[in-house]
Amino acid sequence: MTSTLPFVSVIIPVYNEAENIQKCLNAVTSQTYPKSKYEVLVVDNGSQDGTKEIARQFSTAYDNLEILIEDEQQGSYAARNTGIEQSSGAILAFLDGDCSPHQQWLERGVSTISGTGVDLVGGNVEFTYPNGGTAAERYDSFTNMQMKESISKRNVAKTVNLFVRQDVVEDVGPFPNHLISGGDVHWTKRATDAGYSLTFAHDVIGCHPARPFGELLKKQFRVGKGQIQVWMLDRISLRRVFALALWILVGFLPKPPHYLSQDLRRTGQTVTKAMFVRILVVAWCCRLAENAGRLSYILRSEEQ
């Protein structure tokens, strides 16, 4: 049976992930999928916190794990592209360095993509609460990386936990190297627009730590900058400029409470009234940070 299994390349871009990479690689190297049938490509993007050294310990212990370097361009998409260039698998499994997959992650991901004939599989992201479930962690857990929602409503996915056939990557092309954020959504949209099929697999699970408040604000600022980058990829028209201006104006307003209530119900979470108020404040701060990212990129572009 092993001889008929497809070879898989697990691609993990990392940048200053010393806090999480050991847990991630422990999980990736302990899969039920035969070790002779997969390789792990850790692509370091200029880490300065010991991430590379931790990964090297694993490459010494495991023949199927290799460290690659992408130091010409900063960005996770550039790192993923480097991994793609060096990969040998018929299936590519993208994973973030702070995401720790369940032991049957590879086996179930390959089974889904091979058994159903689909081209892309987005896995489930389960959140953990390193700080006990603060308002910021709660908000992150029901708003970010909602793979089922992204796939069912928008037909796009994130690379935090994504399986793709290698021939799809060959046809669609590489990730946009220059994007700060949103490159995975942009890329998967290109793939599905080209006719490739994408499905969600609830049992292909990766565990991700929910972000604390400061990290969440940094992420949303980066997301805002990436949104403008993606917006600028399409032809600019007066109608689109007007829509962008309205988008930015609305971005200064608090998120309506009923939307947050819907998100909580969708993910099966219940919180106290006091926690809900704190989540509302976090949501507004994140919205402002995202808007600041948009304006920052627009103003920077005007200066160049």
Curated annotation (Swiss-Prot):
Matches recorded under SUPFAM superfamilies: Nucleotide-diphospho-sugar transferases
GO biological processes: S-layer organization
Domain of life according to the entry: Archaea
GO molecular function list: glycosyltransferase activity
EC numbers, comma separated: 2.4.1.-
PANTHER family xref list: GLYCOSYLTRANSFERASE, GLYCOSYLTRANSFERASE 2-LIKE DOMAIN-CONTAINING PROTEIN
Family designation: Belongs to the glycosyltransferase 2 family.
Protein name as annotated: Glycosyltransferase AglE
Gene name for this UniProt entry: aglE
